[in-house]
Structures are given as structure tokens and as C-alpha cells.
């Protein structure tokens, strides 16, 4: 581990992560611009919401670290469900819960209340995936976490635009 830090500061667990190419911006279609046409929420729209979330450890986005990918986002607008699988950069990443919480908060703040959200670790990619997934699925634990001023501040830093 080396010194440095992103949002949390301190020592880095993954001092040299792989950095991936960002996908291009999605072109806006005429149908999407027409306010008279109902515009359903799709996987790309959800990915666009979460791709720029900052990693808590590195000055990079979750997309640049390949923690989130559009192929791991599933949406059913008619059923009002969104599922996002994310992949921590290392199997013992201690930031996995914070990353999942940041994704969940971004979706909670961005989507209509009718949506049921499932944010979870991509199966087989983290040593504690079941424990982390259980925490992220527990509405009371998520609500309690967001009442913690320090934790909410860290989540907000992950969600803020980098300068």
C-alpha cells in the first residue's frame, strides 16, 4: 500500500488500478427531445447517471475503473425496476459498501420514487459480496447510513463533479 488518497485519504488498497476508456456520450434522438413523446428509462440512461460517480480511493470515475459498465445495468420501466451490478477493482476492496451506497444514493436522488432498486456486487468478484449485498438491500441500514453526517459527506464527495 502507498500513501495518497481519493475521497477518504490515507493508504491505497489498490495503488495501481487498470484505467479503462470512457464510453462516448450518447447522441440525443429527436424522439428523446420531443416532450410530447413518453420517454422510458433504459439501461443507458441509468449508466449515464452512475458512470461519473467518483471512486472513493482514486481520482477516477467508476466508469474509468470499470467498476460500472452498461452491460451490468438492467432496467424494466414498465415494472419500475433497476438492477445495477458493480465490480470492485480488487476482491478485498474495503470501499465496496461505500461504492454501492454511492450508486444507490445517486439512483434514489435521480429516479422517480416508483422505481425499486437493486444495487449489488457482480457475483464472484468480491470476498464479502454476500455481506455487502445484504447491507445494500436493507432499506433501514441504508437510511441509517445516510443519517451519519460523516458518511453522507463522503457519499456526496463521490457524487460531486471533479474539478
Curated annotation (Swiss-Prot):
Keywords: Chromosome partition, Cytoplasm, Cytoskeleton, Nucleus. The keyword Oxidoreductase does not apply. GO terms for biological process: chromosome segregation; protein maturation. Transmembrane segments: none annotated. SUPFAM superfamilies: Fe-S cluster assembly (FSCA) domain-like. Component of the cytosolic iron-sulfur protein assembly (CIA) complex, a multiprotein complex that mediates the incorporation of iron-sulfur cluster into extramitochondrial Fe/S proteins. As a CIA complex component and in collaboration with CIAO1 and MMS19, binds to and facilitates the assembly of most cytosolic-nuclear Fe/S proteins. As part of the mitotic spindle-associated MMXD complex it plays a role in chromosome segregation, probably by facilitating iron-sulfur cluster assembly into ERCC2/XPD. Component of the CIA complex. Component of the MMXD complex, which includes CIAO1, ERCC2, CIAO2B, MMS19 and SLC25A5. Interacts with CIAO1, ERCC2 and MMS19; the interactions are direct. Interacts with KIF4A; the interaction facilitates the transfer of Fe-S clusters to KIF4A to ensure proper localization of KIF4A to the mitotic machinery. Interacts with CCDC117; the interaction is direct. This is Cytosolic iron-sulfur assembly component 2B. It comes from Homo sapiens (Human).
